[in-house]
């Protein structure tokens, strides 16, 4: 069973989603099924079929969350240090073409959110960054073509 690296924040988020799905969403769906069942004939009852589908999707996600939580390897980023980029690092990059600064934290696949500056450890940019240090230049093949960046700061916060 492969371990899934994630930050403490990502782990807490998964546990909260699991709690919500089990303690709030599951009872709501059961109530919807019960309500739809009371309408009679199930063969042509769209509400019933929609509720059963919602139940299936919810239970599938519950199973997925339980698996991820069981395989989680929680990494306390605040206890990491060093000059090289690794999981959990917050990296400040400068685009070599536009001189625009970008800040990314390298996190687990499940907690990635580019809008929040959190990129997946398996993303092309994170893979290019791993093992590099301040002053190094990287090139990332992006959908719009290759982009060059220089690492200006690496921190573990």
From Swiss-Prot:
Keyword Transcription attached: yes
Transmembrane parts of this sequence: none
Alphabetized GO MF terms: DNA binding; RNA polymerase binding
PROSITE patterns given in the database record: GREAB_1, GREAB_2
InterPro entries the UniProt entry points to: GreA/GreB_C_sf, TF_GreA/GreB_CS, Tscrpt_elong_fac_GreA, Tscrpt_elong_fac_GreA/B, Tscrpt_elong_fac_GreA/B_C, Tscrpt_elong_fac_GreA/B_fam, Tscrpt_elong_fac_GreA/B_N, Tscrpt_elong_fac_GreA/B_N_sf
SUPFAM superfamilies recorded: FKBP-like (SSF54534), GreA transcript cleavage protein, N-terminal domain (SSF46557)
Entry function: Necessary for efficient RNA polymerase transcription elongation past template-encoded arresting sites. The arresting sites in DNA have the property of trapping a certain fraction of elongating RNA polymerases that pass through, resulting in locked ternary complexes. Cleavage of the nascent transcript by cleavage factors such as GreA or GreB allows the resumption of elongation from the new 3'terminus. GreA releases sequences of 2 to 3 nucleotides.
Family under the similarity heading: Belongs to the GreA/GreB family.
Identification of the protein by name: Transcription elongation factor GreA
Gene that encodes it: greA
